């Protein structure tokens, strides 16, 4: 129960931050260009800082084994996400993309660090990496209807991949950063939650809530993304032995996060229904304030038995 209350409090704080972004956009203080700038700061500054910071832990056999377990778990969970989403929304590319891909980087990390610690980010880095690789390949193919391969240069120069590479080097070499760099990293990482929620608020402000309420597909996508897939993942994490609670909770929350904001980015990039994509992101984000705490509470009951 204590974990659930901590998580619920964190979710409420995040939604208050989203309300700031919402109000600022509606008041004309954040423009569409300003929203893009916030997104760029997230992608190129705060999220990489959070990832690198997560790797600044002591190298132990336990952590190395945990990293391998988290890689295997992330691969299995994302395969489940893609398969379930495809089965549920065969003819709707945006719905299938939205149901398959969550938002662990911007939404999951603040929740995971709230109930665990900054070091738990270490275990969800593989999930974030694999998810983005799938979005670039399978996700784009889904939206365009064309088979696309991975662009090696794009993958290797992506901010999150560079951050993971730097983090792994620091972890395996045991190098210590000077205090001035770790403090700078702390400040940049601290931007992640407020910037991410300001961005969510901007997305919400672009939506007509009356139209959203009338679009039945949004409820279906949210149900699959926030309830069906997380329950399947919860079952898998419960029955598979040898997985520590840091990895369990990290993977569960990553899989239970709302629709990733990249859906709207890719929809606009490939001339798909941008409004529908934004509404899908917004609706699932609103609903997750209820689903994530309940899911974590259920996990706490099952994993304490």
Label the model's feature ranges.
Residues 1-305:
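Alpha-helical transmembrane segments of multi-pass small-molecule/ion transporters
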